[in-house]
């Protein structure tokens, strides 16, 4: 049985390193691996010994924490219907779109194509009886997200009647054939957690852990690519809690009441892991249940444009004639997309359960290095290097 357990853990720890995939689970035996101190000699307190003191029971470890999520499985969290848009254009004649209607939300049920999240931090753990850890990380995180334009509600106004655009004209089309991607800045992040060895038998350890992480990065660069509208915005600002229509100044230098595009990241996780010590190497395998959310308060960001036309242009949006053979000069804004904007919808985990495999290398019971790969609910890699004081 022992040989079977050793073989299974070694195969999982080494074989899965080729296919990297929440938060790291960590080695369940980690609280009891470093039993000697770099600066002070280790002394484990026995809770059943009446002569033991808390000074014997407590120790501190510190080190580096790196977590790299290459593909988090996320979806957008929106309602089935969207309110405040104009009616769907029909026929060939230009028209006014001033009456709001409820329409199916093109973002509903959409998944993200790519979601990356990278964290580098300092690690600090308070150890009790060489069995339980209470730990925290303080560092910096940044991310990258990519999805179809439908997932972020790229909308605009086309086919509008008249020689000017009234302030009450509503967007009437949703652009689904496009891509939206954005990068966040690198900002402060933190996490707290606890880990403990629940059961030990010989060299095997069964443990559990809980973690919570948080960060509030701002969008650094937004890139929207579609046929009717294409634009890039550095450090975008937008409207929160503002119903359609957006102000006519939206996207210009004269825009007011805009706010920074800040994403609120929250994640919690619980995990259960099994490890087996093989001299200096301690492989482990675990399962975890996690929930992550990325919420930008549904901020709506308008396409950048000129406040006044130059060479008859306010944006680089193309003129769309379709079957027409000549421009409609009486409705001069009907043939290209106006007041285009996107909404950064709330994103959350699409799969909650995942698997992690890893191994810890120990040196002199004072130093350790851990590598971990995670699968199913994300593809991620984790590295942890620490020492005991």
UniProtKB/Swiss-Prot annotation:
Keywords: Cell outer membrane, Cell shape, Disulfide bond, Ion transport, Membrane, Porin, Signal, Transmembrane, Transmembrane beta strand, Transport. GO terms for cellular component: cell outer membrane; pore complex. In elementary bodies (EBs, the infectious stage, which is able to survive outside the host cell) provides the structural integrity of the outer envelope through disulfide cross-links with the small cysteine-rich protein and the large cysteine-rich periplasmic protein. It has been described in publications as the Sarkosyl-insoluble COMC (Chlamydia outer membrane complex), and serves as the functional equivalent of peptidoglycan. Permits diffusion of specific solutes through the outer membrane. GO terms for biological process: monoatomic ion transport; regulation of cell shape. It comes from the Bacteria. InterPro entries: Major_OMP_Chlamydia. Part of a disulfide cross-linked outer membrane complex (COMC) composed of the major outer membrane porin (MOMP), the small cysteine-rich protein (OmcA) and the large cysteine-rich periplasmic protein (OmcB). Pfam families: Chlam_OMP. Its main location: membrane. The keyword Membrane applies. It is a multi-pass membrane protein. This is Major outer membrane porin. It is found in: Cell outer membrane. Residues 1-22 form the signal peptide. Belongs to the chlamydial porin (CP) (TC 1.B.2) family. GO terms for molecular function: porin activity; structural molecule activity. The gene is ompA.
């Amino acid at each position: 049985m022992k040989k079977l357990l050793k073989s299974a853990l070694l195969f999982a720890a080494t074989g899965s390193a080729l296919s990297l995939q929440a938060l790291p689970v960590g080695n369940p035996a980690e609280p009891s691996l470093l039993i000697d101190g770099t600066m002070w000699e280790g002394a484990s307190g026995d809770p059943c010994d009446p002569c033991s003191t808390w000074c014997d029971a407590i120790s501190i470890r510190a080190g580096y924490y790196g977590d790299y999520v290459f593909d988090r499985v996320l979806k957008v969290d929106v309602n089935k219907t969207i309110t405040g848009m104009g009616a769907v254009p029909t026929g060939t004649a230009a028209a006014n779109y001033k009456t709001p209607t409820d329409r199916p939300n093109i973002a509903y049920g959409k998944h993200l194509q790519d979601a990356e999240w990278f964290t580098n931090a300092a690690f600090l753990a308070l150890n009790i009886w060489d069995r339980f850890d209470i730990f925290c990380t303080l560092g910096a995180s940044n991310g990258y997200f990519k999805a179809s334009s439908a997932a972020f509600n790229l909308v605009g106004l086309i086919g509008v009647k008249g020689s000017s655009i009234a302030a009450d004209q509503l967007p009437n089309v949703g652009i689904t054939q496009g891509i939206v991607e954005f990068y966040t800045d690198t900002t402060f992040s933190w996490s707290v957690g606890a880990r403990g060895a629940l059961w030990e038998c010989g060299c095997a350890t069964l443990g559990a852990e809980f973690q919570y992480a948080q960060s509030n990065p701002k969008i650094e660069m937004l890139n929207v690519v579609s046929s009717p509208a294409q634009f890039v915005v550095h450090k975008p600002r937008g409207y929160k809690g503002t119903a359609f229509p957006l102000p006519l100044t939206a996207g210009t230098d004269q825009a007011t009441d805009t706010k920074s595009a800040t994403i609120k990241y929250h994640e919690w996780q619980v995990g259960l892991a099994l490890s087996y010590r093989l001299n200096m190497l301690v492989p482990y395998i675990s399962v975890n249940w996690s929930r992550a959310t990325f919420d930008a308060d549904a901020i709506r960001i308008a396409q950048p444009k000129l406040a006044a036309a130059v060479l008859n242009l306010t944006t680089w949006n193309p003129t769309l004639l379709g079957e027409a053979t000549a421009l409609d000069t009486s409705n001069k804004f009907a043939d290209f997309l106006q007041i285009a904007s996107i909404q950064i919808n709330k994103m959350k985990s699409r799969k909650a359960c995942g698997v992690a495999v890893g191994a810890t290398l120990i040196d002199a019971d004072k130093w350790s290095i851990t590598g971990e790969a995670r699968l199913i609910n994300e593809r991620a890699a984790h590295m942890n290097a620490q020492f005991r004081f």
